[in-house]
Design a protein with these regions (language model features):
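A short beta-loop-alpha structural element at the N-terminal edge
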Residues: 2-15
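Active-site rim helix/loop that mediates acceptor-substrate recognition in acyltransferases
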Residues: 25-49, 53, 57, 62
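Conserved acetyl-CoA binding element of GNAT-fold acetyltransferases
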Residues: 69-80
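Conserved acetyl-CoA-binding loop-helix of GNAT-fold acetyltransferases
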Residues: 78, 84-97
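Conserved GNAT acetyl-CoA-binding A-motif
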Residues: 92, 99-112
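Conserved catalytic-core motifs of GNAT/GCN5-like acyltransferases
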Residues: 108-110, 125-142
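Conserved active-site tyrosine of GNAT-family acetyltransferases
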Residues: 119-120, 124
Length: 150
C-alpha cells in the first residue's frame, strides 16, 4: 500500500528520477536544475512529501504557505509509469488537508495544459493561461481553489 511521508534529503535522487520520467510532456528539461536546487536546499516555509510504494518513491509534491491565507502547490509529480493509479489524488488531498490545517483560505498552483483537467477535477479553477509559459509546448495554467472557512 502506498505510504505518504515527509521528504528527507536522501530522497533527492529518487525525486529527480521521477522528474525525469515526466520530461518533456509535463516538465521542460530546463526546469531540472531548479528542482534539484529546491530539493537540496529545502526552504523551511515549504513542506515536501513523498509517496513510497514497495520501497520506491513513486510520487512527490510540496506545499508552500505564500502568506497568511494562501498556500501554493509546488513541484508535484508522479512516476510517469504510475499515472492514473490514484497517487496524484492521494498526494493532492494530503497537501490540501495540510493547507487547511495551516489556516489557508485558498490554494494556488501553476501547471500545464496536460494536467489542468486533473486539478479541475479537484475543484481548482483556471485564473490565467500563458502560452508556452513553462517552455515550448508547455502552457502555464494558473489555478486556484477556494477552501471552505474552518
Amino acid at each position: 500500500m502506498p505510504t505518504l511521508r515527509p521528504y528527507t534529503p536522501p530522497d533527492a535522487p529518487a525525486c529527480l528520477a521521477l522528474f525525469d520520467t515526466n520530461v518533456p510532456r509535463y516538465f521542460g528539461p530546463h526546469e531540472r536544475h531548479d528542482f534539484a536546487n529546491y530539493l537540496l536546499h529545502p526552504d523551511r516555509a515549504h513542506d515536501y512529501l513523498v509517496i513510497e510504494h514497495n520501497g520506491h518513491v513513486v510520487a512527490c509534491g510540496g506545499l508552500a504557505l505564500d502568506n497568511e491565507h494562501t498556500a501554493a502547490f509546488c513541484w508535484g509529480m508522479v512516476d510517469n509509469a504510475q499515472h492514473r493509479q490514484g497517487l496524484g489524488k492521494q498526494l493532492s488531498h494530503a497537501r490540501l488537508a495540510h493547507a487547511k490545517a495551516l489556516g489557508a483560505q485558498r490554494v494556488t498552483l501553476s501547471t500545464s495544459q496536460h494536467t489542468q483537467d486533473f486539478y479541475a477535477g479537484l475543484g481548482f479553477a483556471v485564473t490565467h493561461i500563458t502560452p508556452d509559459g513553462h517552455g515550448a509546448g508547455l502552457d502555464a495554467v494558473e489555478m486556484v481553489l477556494e477552501l471552505a472557512p474552518r
